[in-house]
Amino acid sequence: MSRLQDFYKSKVAVDLQAKFGYKSVMEVPRITKITLNMGVSEAVADKKVIEHAVSDLTKIAGQKPVITKTRKAIAGFKIRENYPIGCMVTLRGQRMYEFLDRLVAIALPRVRDFRGISGRAFDGRGNYNIGVKEQIIFPEIEYDKIDALRGLNISITTSAKTDEEAKALLTAFSFPFRN
């Protein structure tokens, strides 16, 4: 079991149960999955770009991503149906907790001019989204070996019913919220 998973079971779940007055431990919100999504619009012109994005996301997540394809053709963007346009990976279980640990402890503090993450990026249902502008904040990516700076979206899905519960959960995992 990873460090954060132990921390959740021993400390966070107990604290949240006391704070929100849950009757059962199963009511306590938990992180169910983390989805990493990298949209690569440059892949329309050059097919090699998607391979670089897949290798970057594989290094970051620790598992092979799925290549996302366009659903329908859009002439204005010069894309046809089933064109590779990005890649995504869903993390659950131990890999999810290990990624969360690296994100909070190593990657986020490496962001240039970092003052904390926004507390307003919740979706109203207890899920949180973080946009990362550069993939080089992760220690697995070597600066010399990348072809271009690419951003990615990190979507943290929780079992919390409200944003307040989700924020309390992520704060317990020492997420550096600005407000």
Swiss-Prot record:
Keywords: Ribonucleoprotein, Ribosomal protein, RNA-binding, rRNA-binding, tRNA-binding
Cellular component aspect of the GO annotation: ribonucleoprotein complex; ribosome
MF annotations from Gene Ontology: rRNA binding; structural constituent of ribosome; tRNA binding
Paired cysteines (S-S): none
Gene3D superfamilies assigned: 3.30.1440.10
Database matches in HAMAP family: Ribosomal_uL5_B (MF_01333_B)
Family: Belongs to the universal ribosomal protein uL5 family.
Name this protein carries in UniProt: Large ribosomal subunit protein uL5
Lineage of origin: Bacteria, Pseudomonadati, Pseudomonadota, Betaproteobacteria, Burkholderiales
Encoding gene, per UniProt annotation: rplE
